[in-house]
């Protein structure tokens, strides 16, 4: 499947990544992307920036190297109440919010606890996508959570770094299960490289292979085109980004 948007990338600001936004944009162009989301870790992760970093993304250009830039964050799931570690005052300056479990922030518990947290994250209305759900340390009820995500128009990320098999070990088979259940339920999928170095921005080959193998229709993959991604943001109630009118109307 052709994928023209990468919705999960990091810069050196995350504390354990190694490239600048400009370097990421250059790689995005070289790798054939039309658009990518810059989504550094929110502040509860060790080494991550203060929330001002995300609020100030309003100064970023809408295009770098001819590639559209979406202003985002990978927030942390903080508790079972559905809280993330970004103040609500920052929301107006962001286009895209991922929420993910990370072991340094949320101590792994049992499936019921993780399921409750994910359901409340979905229902809080602030989160556009759930990140790298395959992690076996954070088991959850796939069908219940994915059904809720469908009902609330929250995208399910398939993460290319996870599919390499050396990060969040034990996730690969679970990602296939999530993709199959998501396909059957009709969820929206998004695709992220989870790049921590610029050369990986736009590297979505394993995700593409998985989606083809499972038989997911491109109409349910919001990153199949930049137009589909922007349409999904509007479906979620986000204000259209004027600088992308030409993309939207292409």
From Swiss-Prot:
Its cofactor is Zn(2+). Zn(2+) 3 binds at residues 74, 102, 132. Zn(2+) 1 binds at residues 8, 10, 74, 194. This is Probable phosphatase VIBHAR_04983. It comes from Vibrio campbellii (strain ATCC BAA-1116). Belongs to the PHP family. GO terms for cellular component: cytosol. InterPro entries: Phosphatase_YcdX_put, PHP_dom, PHP_phosphatase, Pol/His_phosphatase_N, Pol/histidinol_Pase-like. Pfam families: PHP (PF02811). Its EC number is 3.1.3.-. Keywords: Hydrolase, Metal-binding, Zinc. The keyword Secreted does not apply. Binds 3 Zn(2+) ions per subunit. It comes from the Bacteria. HAMAP family: YcdX_phosphat. Zn(2+) 2 binds at residues 16, 41, 196. GO terms for molecular function: phosphatase activity; zinc ion binding.
């Amino acid at each position: 499947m052709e994928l023209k948007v990468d919705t999960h990338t990091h810069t050196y600001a995350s504390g354990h990544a190694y490239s600048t936004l400009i370097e990421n944009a250059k790689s995005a162009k070289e790798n054939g992307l039309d658009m990518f989301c810059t989504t550094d870790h929110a502040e509860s992760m060790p080494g991550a920036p203060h929330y001002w970093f995300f609020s100030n993304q309003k100064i970023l250009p809408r295009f770098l190297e001819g590639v559209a830039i979406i202003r985002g964050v990978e927030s942390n799931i903080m508790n079972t109440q559905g809280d993330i570690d970004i103040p609500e005052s920052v929301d107006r300056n962001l286009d895209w919010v991922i929420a993910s479990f990370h072991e340094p922030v949320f101590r792994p518990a049992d499936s019921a606890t993780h399921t409750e947290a994910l359901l409340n994250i979905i229902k809080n209305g602030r989160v556009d996508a759930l990140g790298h759900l395959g992690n076996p340390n954070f088991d959850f009820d796939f069908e219940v959570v994915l059904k809720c995500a469908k009902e609330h128009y929250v995208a399910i990320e398939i993460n290319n770094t996870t599919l390499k098999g050396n990060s969040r070990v034990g996730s690969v088979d679970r990602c296939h299960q999530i993709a199959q259940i998501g396909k059957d339920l009709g969820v929206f999928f998004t695709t992220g490289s989870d790049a921590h170095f610029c050369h990986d921005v736009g590297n979505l080959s394993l995700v593409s292979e998985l989606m083809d193998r499972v038989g997911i229709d491109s109409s349910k993959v919001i990153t199949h085109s930049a137009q589909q991604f922007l349409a999904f943001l509007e479906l979620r109630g986000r204000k259209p980004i004027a600088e992308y009118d030409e993309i939207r109307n292409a």
